[in-house]
Swiss-Prot record:
Belongs to the RbfA family. It holds the Pfam family RBFA. It is found in: Cytoplasm. This is Ribosome-binding factor A. One of its GO terms (cellular component) is cytosol. Keywords: Cytoplasm, Ribosome biogenesis. It comes from Lactobacillus delbrueckii subsp. bulgaricus (strain ATCC 11842 / DSM 20081 / BCRC 10696 / JCM 1002 / NBRC 13953 / NCIMB 11778 / NCTC 12712 / WDCM 00102 / Lb 14). GO terms for molecular function: ribosomal small subunit binding. One of several proteins that assist in the late maturation steps of the functional core of the 30S ribosomal subunit. Associates with free 30S ribosomal subunits (but not with 30S subunits that are part of 70S ribosomes or polysomes). Required for efficient processing of 16S rRNA. May interact with the 5'-terminal helix region of 16S rRNA. PANTHER family: RIBOSOME-BINDING FACTOR A, CHLOROPLASTIC-RELATED. Monomer. Binds 30S ribosomal subunits, but not 50S ribosomal subunits or 70S ribosomes. Its main location: cytoplasm.
Length: 120
């Protein structure tokens, strides 16, 4: 059963990525990238994790509002492309791992710069 769940999550991720690029014209979601999907055991809910290229708080709120507005359309189009009995309800959550990774990159760059300053 776990293998099927993984396949379904991967297929939902691929289809949602296609849908947001081709069918959703809202400029608020133009910088959104879906990173992962986790489905409930009965496939009634799908938590979709997304990231943004910007760390601007206003852009994050706008992207969240855009995703919520497009949720119904995305679910409808997802239902047309998937061969499932029931299309899962979509729940969008911000993926914090991208922010965490960029923070670590900045810290490492700062450490490297400090090390170079000490040597000079």
């Amino acid at each position: 059963m776990k293998h099927r769940k993984g396949r379904v999550e991967g297929e939902i991720l691929r289809e949602l990525t296609k849908i947001i690029r081709k069918n959703i014209r809202d400029p608020r979601v133009s910088n959104v990238t879906f990173t992962a999907v986790e489905c409930s055991n009965d496939f009634s809910y799908a938590t979709v994790y997304y990231s943004l290229l910007t760390e601007d708080e206003q852009a994050q709120k706008e992207a969240e509002a855009g995703l919520e507005k497009a949720k119904g359309t995305m679910r409808h189009l997802l239902g047309q492309s998937l061969t499932m009995y029931k299309v899962p309800e979509l729940i969008f959550k911000r993926d914090q791992s991208v922010i965490y990774g960029s923070k670590i990159d900045r810290l490492l760059a700062d450490l490297k710069k400090q090390e170079q300053d000490r040597q000079n």
